């Protein structure tokens, strides 16, 4: 079965948190570890803190993000440049 025919995946606990915040009509940060969840139109306007493996990164959800996954907006790997090692010529002497 192709993915287009299936409903988008959203973790139940995340969906419950979104509905609870929508009922309160308050703005608060929602913390989640579910990077595989799809962004639904009900999430637009909320700030969701998504786990990147080390910490939670807050992301404000906008309309162009609908239909994509939460994990796409939080990188898990950071490239460390080797320029600092090259500039340190005193340690080579």
UniProtKB/Swiss-Prot annotation:
- UniProt cross-references to InterPro entries, sorted A to Z: Ribosomal_uS19, Ribosomal_uS19_bac-type, Ribosomal_uS19_CS, Ribosomal_uS19_SF
Which Pfam family is an annotated match for this chain, by its short name? Ribosomal_S19
Q: Where in the cell is it found?
A: Plastid, Chloroplast
GO molecular function per UniProt: rRNA binding; structural constituent of ribosome
Q: Which domain of life, per UniProt?
A: Eukaryota
Primary location? plastid
* A Gene Ontology cellular-component term: chloroplast
Give GO BP annotations, semicolon-separated. Answer: ribosomal small subunit assembly; translation
| Keywords associated with the record | Chloroplast, Plastid, Ribonucleoprotein, Ribosomal protein, RNA-binding, rRNA-binding
Q: What does this protein do?
A: Protein S19 forms a complex with S13 that binds strongly to the 16S ribosomal RNA.
Concerning PANTHER family, the annotation shows: RIBOSOMAL PROTEIN S19P FAMILY MEMBER, SMALL RIBOSOMAL SUBUNIT PROTEIN US19M
Please state what the protein is called.
Small ribosomal subunit protein uS19c
């Amino acid at each position: 079965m192709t993915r287009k025919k299936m409903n988008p995946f959203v973790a139940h606990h995340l969906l419950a948190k979104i509905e609870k915040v929508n009922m309160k009509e308050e703005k608060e940060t929602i913390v989640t570890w579910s990077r595989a969840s799809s962004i639904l139109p009900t999430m637009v306007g909320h700030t969701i803190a998504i786990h990147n493996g080390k910490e939670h990164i807050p992301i404000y959800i906008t309309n162009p993000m609908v239909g994509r996954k939460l994990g796409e907006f939080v990188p898990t790997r950071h490239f460390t440049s080797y320029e600092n090692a090259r500039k340190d010529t005193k340690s080579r002497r």
